[in-house]
Regions:
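Low-complexity, glycine/alanine/valine/leucine- and proline-rich hydrophobic stretches
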Residues: 198-228, 236-237
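Short beta-strand segments
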Residues: 182-183, 194-197
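One-carbon transfer enzymes
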Residues: 1-176, 181, 226-229, 235, ...
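Short acidic, glycine-rich loop/turn motifs
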Residues: 183-190, 223-225
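Short coil-to-beta-strand transition motifs
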Residues: 159, 188-194
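Glycine-rich beta-alpha junction loops
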Residues: 141-144, 188, 199
Length: 259
């Protein structure tokens, strides 16, 4: 597309700064990028604004879409704000809210927010250009501000001792990437699995937590207050399969367990 690209490994590199200054930009827009040094975001006449995939000050951090679903939120949105010295704390320009559907996975929500965000960036640029922007300061701290830290292997593991809704939300909040995972013991063999599509059923039962109950077409796992029905799973060393396909060539022992 004949775009002029600067891709520095060090954002404070003097050569990069010089080339950026030569562009003489009067406004900079940032989407899904690392923290900028002050010399960069202060450079344009009208500053630098960022698009963030949450309703700030909620879910500051690297994974706002994931954590909104993991925490069971029923709404989220996008925010444009002017960048300042800290991460995701600058003055808010515009916000747009949308619902989170009960069975929505993070990949689906990401795509809806992507289009919403593009429209909000366009609106923000137009209002800055026309001198029509009125900003709002963010609340900087407080017990109600939830964060969205980077996702690591440790916080993607399913805790089968959690309640039904928490497990369900964690799995869909990590689907398709990076994926919620669990240890599984079957026929005396321990392995790792990633679980993707699931459904839930809230019901009292007497099964032990984590026990796997297969049938001809589905796989369910007992949790404290119901069952998680696994619709899509990837066993380590195998490809991702829907439950019915897995059950065609894979058998579970009577004491098979997720843990």
């Amino acid at each position: 597309n004949n775009l002029y690209l600067l891709q520095p490994s060090n954002l404070k590199d003097e050569g990069f700064i010089s080339k950026l200054k030569l562009l003489n930009a009067n406004l900079q827009v940032v989407v899904a990028f690392r923290m900028l040094p002050k010399i960069v975001w202060k450079m344009p006449q009208y500053g630098t604004f960022n698009l963030h995939a949450s309703l700030l000050p909620l879910y500051r951090g690297a994974a706002p879409i994931h954590w909104a679903i993991i925490n069971g939120e029923n709404k989220t949105g996008v925010t444009t704000f002017f960048i300042d010295e800290k991460i995701d704390t600058g003055k808010i320009i515009f916000q747009k809210e949308i619902p989170i559907y009960d069975d929505e996975i993070v990949g689906e929500l990401h795509d809806r927010l992507m289009y919403l965000g593009a429209d909000l960036v366009s609106k923000t640029v137009t209002h800055i250009q026309n001198g029509e922007v009125k900003t709002q300061k963010q609340i900087q701290d407080g017990k109600n501000i939830k964060m969205a830290p980077k996702l690591f292997t440790e916080n993607c593991k399913i805790n089968w001792g959690d309640n039904l809704d928490s497990i369900y939300n964690r799995i869909r909040g990590l689907n398709p990437s990076p994926g919620a995972w669990s240890k599984m013991k079957n026929n005396g063999v321990e392995t790792t699995v990633k679980i993707y599509r699931v459904k839930k059923e809230k019901i009292k039962h007497s099964n032990s937590i984590g026990c796997i109950i297969p049938s001809k077409k589905n796989i369910k796992v007992a949790v404290e207050d119901g069952y998680i029905f696994i619709e899509e799973i990837k066993i380590s060393g195998k490809k991702k399969l829907d439950a019915a396909s897995l059950l065609n060539g894979f058998s579970f022992s009577s004491d098979a367990t997720m843990y």
